[in-house]
Amino acid sequence: MSRRNISKKRFPEADSTYNSYLVSLLITRILKSGKKNLAQNIVNAAFEIIKVKTNEDPLVVFERAIRNASPVVEVKARRIGGSTYQVPVEVSGFRATNLSLRWIIQYSRQRVGRTMSIKLANEIIDTANDIGNTIKKKEETHKMQMPIKHLHIFVINY
């Protein structure tokens, strides 16, 4: 048995502009090559675009988008009796938030547009309105577990 100390999970501090933990998670997900200032500028510009387009508080729209994109169930590979099955597993709250952030950023990068802030703003607005590629990804994840619901009994060790 390992004698190493278990490292504590570290969370980023709340964002200074919006005082939100979710916004700081978004900034760290957008971050590339340590350029945090650029990532903050992208997120702030995206939130300004959201404010102009929707006439709502961008933080409320962003939180609604995260809630809409968060999956409830995902499938994991589980080896049972010599064969591998895709077993449906419930997703914890933190993992669901991380997955939704990852999907929003992934599909905003794939969008056609001039700047990342415009693409990110459009993806957040679409996700908040229950349309777009992020919602399709969530529904696809839920559909993957539909034909194999009977395998939920093998989830004991997860």
From Swiss-Prot:
<keyword id="KW-0687">Ribonucleoprotein</keyword>
<keyword id="KW-0934">Plastid</keyword>
<keyword id="KW-0699">rRNA-binding</keyword>
<protein>
    <recommendedName>
        <fullName>Small ribosomal subunit protein uS7c</fullName>
    </recommendedName>
</protein>
<keyword id="KW-0689">Ribosomal protein</keyword>
<dbReference type="GO" id="GO:0003735">
    <property type="term" value="F:structural constituent of ribosome"/>
</dbReference>
<dbReference type="InterPro" id="IPR023798">
    <property type="entry name" value="Ribosomal_uS7_dom"/>
</dbReference>
<dbReference type="Pfam" id="PF00177">
    <property type="entry name" value="Ribosomal_S7"/>
</dbReference>
<keyword id="KW-0150">Chloroplast</keyword>
<dbReference type="InterPro" id="IPR036823">
    <property type="entry name" value="Ribosomal_uS7_dom_sf"/>
</dbReference>
<keyword id="KW-0694">RNA-binding</keyword>
<dbReference type="InterPro" id="IPR005717">
    <property type="entry name" value="Ribosomal_uS7_bac/org-type"/>
</dbReference>
<dbReference type="GO" id="GO:0006412">
    <property type="term" value="P:translation"/>
</dbReference>
<dbReference type="GO" id="GO:0009507">
    <property type="term" value="C:chloroplast"/>
</dbReference>
<dbReference type="InterPro" id="IPR020606">
    <property type="entry name" value="Ribosomal_uS7_CS"/>
</dbReference>
<comment type="subunit">
    <text>Part of the 30S ribosomal subunit.</text>
</comment>
<comment type="function">
    <text>One of the primary rRNA binding proteins, it binds directly to 16S rRNA where it nucleates assembly of the head domain of the 30S subunit.</text>
</comment>
<dbReference type="GO" id="GO:0015935">
    <property type="term" value="C:small ribosomal subunit"/>
</dbReference>
<comment type="similarity">
    <text>Belongs to the universal ribosomal protein uS7 family.</text>
</comment>
<dbReference type="InterPro" id="IPR000235">
    <property type="entry name" value="Ribosomal_uS7"/>
</dbReference>
<dbReference type="GO" id="GO:0019843">
    <property type="term" value="F:rRNA binding"/>
</dbReference>
